[in-house]
Amino acid sequence: MIHVFFNNQKSDSLKMSSPNKSLLFLAFIFIFLSQNSCSPGKNTGQDQKSQLLQLKKEISEDLLENLLPYWSMIMPDTINGGFYGRVDASEQVYPNADKGGILNARILWTFSSAYRIFKDSSYLHMANYAKDYIVSHFLDEEYGGAYRTVNEIGEPADTRKHTLTESYFIYAFAEYYRATGDQKALDNAIEIFKLLEKHALDKDLNGYYEVFTRDWERSRDLLLNENSPEDEKTMITHLHLVEAYAGLYRVWPEKQMEERLRNVLELFINKIVDKETFHTIYFLDRNWNPTTQIDSYGHDIEGAWLIVEAARLLNDAELLEDVEKLSIKISNAAKEGLEEDGSMLTEKDLSTGHVVTIRSWWEQAESIVGYLNAYEITGDESYLDISMNSWIYIKNHFIDNVNGGWFSLVSESGEPVGRDKANYWTCPYHNGRMGMEVVERIQ
């Protein structure tokens, strides 16, 4: 009997009584290691174990020898502090580019998590550097929360408060506290959480609004979908609130935090996931009516595993069972974006039939974690095959073996298309987190 062990309980996660399905998920594969008992085309248990360990080896090598060193070397702005706001596909640094809040928060999260797992002092140095710059330049001392962008010398540029951006600062500060025990970082995460609950929450219809002025007055500025003025709520923001609130609850298990995590998780389940297609609904009006018809495959598969991660923290066996079942349905829906070459497409507009065939780095990374999660839940090796094929595609097309790091976009034929390697959205968080999820899950 072969035991493939997945470690789903992080070393410093909440100490709770185990639900019916332990948080330490054991994927038991009962296979007799004889030719007669193996189905044609199926791997033996030993083959699966070898595959998983090889996957972990290759991904951890890329993480530790390529991805994290690349971001450590090229991104720090040694003149003005913080991190450069843009690096293009030819490795050209743009020192005058504005510095994005999401980019800086994601860098803080990535190196905090890396230090927590690997205990490498160089990662702590990067995390400290990121945290100090954020505290000094992004946090708004007068009105609270964090600016959306600052200029190259750290002065406020876009002072609007964007719920999505604020969620990443919660996520990053909570992870930094988890890695270092720095109380001020936890205080910062809690303060931003309370500001969102005060200003961003729709107290009548539930859910969270998108954009605010610096002093937290509601704004109808369109940041995520400039073509739909009816949008007031988005899948992306609610997904990353699930992620951020789960991260904060893990280190701050107060009753109010538990209630708000449960609320946003249930919102995602009941309002964001389409109960007929099991795709996530991209944009919605205030009353939760869809305003667009877009299937975003990467967000589907990312959401599929993040909702399970959140449910596991809530110590509710019935909820976890329901969420795991839903996660598999979402994962199956996201298969519509998978191509024969192992890649995942970006999205499809159902109103026009237009498919965005360009491949983005983050969807490929989330595909690995999402289908590994589905494999853990079900033991169905077809999900493991998807994760393996995603990694093969990444190795062949996304890893930059010349300059380091990953390309951010490749064409349908797998060629880099010249997109920035770092900017407001492009960061080490999706692929870095994928690497750390694989390292922690596969034991």
Spell out what each predicted region is.
Residues 42-443:
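Glycan-recognition and catalytic cores of secretory/periplasmic carbohydrate-active enzymes
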Residues 1-47:
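Bacterial Sec-dependent N-terminal signal peptides
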